């Protein structure tokens, strides 16, 4: 069954394995996870748990920022006996009997050696060309080429007379939801609410990440 938790990316460091191997790891701090809702097939058509992460400030009538909770959000969190949460995510294929509404989900849900998928929002790179954005090869840099870093052909001229969808063009790069699959948990530090994940995970420092059991290898 799937296990999951939400956290923030602290940064990267390195640890030594038992055989002396140097392992690059990403530090994820995962505290304040609370089960806000349990969904069942009878009522909702599918089974899942809804987890909230990081408290929001209480509702204010003259609020000018989304850091303050709305009245519906306050009512939803009140059913779980907790404060409104800033981030809310669902986890399917979960043993719902093992969770209760209002229960705190801690990092010791996972164990060292577990294989997980980590989802986050990639770093924004701003407006970039086709080479950096899509990995396109550049043209010859020699004198007289007249084709160096341009996107290339836009398509046929007379017949189609249009640029087809999917053409690799310059544009805004990054800021996409990215999932890194089959990453290994190197260490779980329950005292500090920290999980060490082998390798890198999407997003900048302090970015929100979602960790769940690998859909390809986690249930084997």
From Swiss-Prot:
UniProt keyword annotations, A-Z: Ribonucleoprotein, Ribosomal protein, RNA-binding, rRNA-binding
Segments traversing the membrane: none
Gene Ontology CC terms, in alphabetical order: cytosolic large ribosomal subunit
GO molecular function annotations of the record: rRNA binding; structural constituent of ribosome
GO BP term, pick one: translation
Role played: One of the primary rRNA binding proteins, it binds directly near the 3'-end of the 23S rRNA, where it nucleates assembly of the 50S subunit.
Self-association state and partner proteins as the record states: Part of the 50S ribosomal subunit. Forms a cluster with proteins L14 and L19.
Similarity comment text for this entry: Belongs to the universal ribosomal protein uL3 family.
Protein name: Large ribosomal subunit protein uL3
Gene that produces this protein: rplC
